[in-house]
Amino acid sequence: MDHSKSDFTQGSILKKLTLFMIPVLGALILQAAYGAVDLLVVGRFGTTAGLSAVSTGSQVLNLITFVVTQFAMGITVLIARYIGEKKMNSIGALIGGATVVFAIISAIIFVVMIMLASPISTLMQAPKEALGLTATYVRICGAGIFFIVAYNLLSAIFRGLGDSKSPLLFVAVACVINIIGDLVLVAGLHLDAAGAAMATVFAQAISVVFALMLLFKRKLPFKITKHDFKINPHCVQALKIGLPLALQECLTQISFLALCAFINRLGLEASSGYGVACKIVNFAMLVPSSLMQSMASFVAQNVGAGDEKRAKHAMFTGMGIGLIIGVVVFISVLFKGDLLTSIFTTEKAVILQGYAYLKGFALETIVTAVLFSMVGYFNGHYQTVWVMVQGLIQTLLVRLPLSYYMSIQPHANLTNIGLAAPIATIVGIILNVCFYIYLSKKMKKENA
């Protein structure tokens, strides 16, 4: 690994942030494609019930994946901070302790998803025609949760080291295997939603094996010994950083599950249309998401090196990048959303329902560029409790109540329900601007 390229404390901010962000974005694109392939193949070669099952079941899997990713953010930020502070000896202990913690988390999730797959599907209000298939999808994905958690842990480690290219390779391997698996199991053997779930698990397993091989061959600036594999102060510190983010993400994703349940009550076509729209949304949100992940590592290194001015400059640079791309995505989603949804299904009613949701959601692709850049900046400063608070306000006090209100109107439609997301984000921006002003004054006073 060329450590000069992973040093964010000097050189052009725009160049270094962009070069680090591009592989992160590439990995996120492939992850979104990874999930989209399941819907695409099931939509083309499976049943409408199978499509609904993958749509609803993938919401549950997304909940688990996003929560684990936020837990892992604590590891990414802390590794980057140690690098900025030149504390290389602490990194091995952090990784060893984190491995133990994530193994425990995996075991808990495994038991819950296997034992409670049917109640979870019922709670999600999956259409009765798709209830059994949804439970099967959740159960199979639960069986492979160890691989999903391991992938996110390994990716967090590499990104903390300033290496965003390796996680891109990991997910590229998984994406290729998943496509092959879907074509064989769904298109070839007609296993419908179950086949999509099996392909997902197998692809993640191969990806983890590849990642471990790469890690063992890599020359790293630290050592890991068997004595590091225990719960220690370093992994506890990472948990303190990641836990608020994980809690916030958990409740945010639960709100999306609740939204899925609200929409499921509108019928099978609305359920399937929303599922297809979510895949488009996943792609649309990739740039702000990659900005947030990249910003956390970039800012953490500079904070560790004592360069707050550079950290702030990085945040505003990220906003500029995100806004430019966000406008392009906004126009595409708003005016060509029906063409995008038609990629995943040939059923006209489902295409129109998906496009209806995208019309309401479209503004989110612009405003999130600002919000996520600020969130990444705060994460790099260890201000994860605030990130949790502002996220919960958006989720529990704005997005969820507004979505529910829209869903119970006499002529409820997906466009109005989709509006809840950008409205909540705008509220979040206002809150974060206020906190940014407060934090800047506090740091200025402390350094006076």
Feature map (PLM): residue ranges:
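Small-residue-rich hydrophobic transmembrane alpha-helices
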Residues: 51-111, 148-167, 273-331, 335-337, ...
